[in-house]
Amino acid sequence: MRQKHYLEAAARGLHDSCPGQARYLLWAYTSSHDDKSTFEETCPYCFQLLVLDNSRVRLKPKARLTPKIQKLLNREARNYTLSFKEAKMVKKFKDSKSVLLITCKTCNRTVKHHGKSRSFVSTLKSNPATPTSKLSLKTPERRTANPNHDMSGSKGKSPASVFRTPTSGQSVSTCSSKNTSKTKKHFSQLKMLLSQNESQKIPKVDFRNFLSSLKGGLLK
């Protein structure tokens, strides 16, 4: 395998300077092996590297879906019996393949590379290699606390310390209620202090004090 990659790299390097030597290297490797394996992007007849300058590429598409073929496919899907001629037409449509035609300009020969048929593609879609059920991630299940396990592990502890452990939501609610009660208490204390100061600054005015103030004003 390493020799094959090395010879292919050497042939590509000698393609512009010495194309004959490059073709000889590719031919020497293919002739020395029994499997008759050819290189990619290489003409199997003259061992010329198939590049844009010395090759012509064409694509022969698959057979098109005609209204008649569509009608036969619908009948087949409904489990209707088809005649021999109709079944042959449907089979030919399903087995049709796209063909890539590469013509070498050096030897003027064409190499065909066949694609996959419609039936093969449909089987791949219906039976994928990796099913979707395996790819779906499982959600982690919550573990429920076992009361027997808690009782066995909490020997020597009081029941209050075992079963009265507050959760995070309960602790947050208790802390918030304590804070609100403290603020209300401070507000009431401040209000009482302000009312006491106002009462000390303003003297009490009764009827006796009013008469004494009038008397003092008349004497003056």
Curated annotation (Swiss-Prot):
The gene is C18orf21. The modification Phosphoserine is found at residue 126. The modification Phosphothreonine is found at residues 130, 139. It comes from the Eukaryota. Residues 171-180 have a biased composition (Low complexity). Residues 119-136 have a biased composition (Polar residues). InterPro entries: DUF4674. This is UPF0711 protein C18orf21.
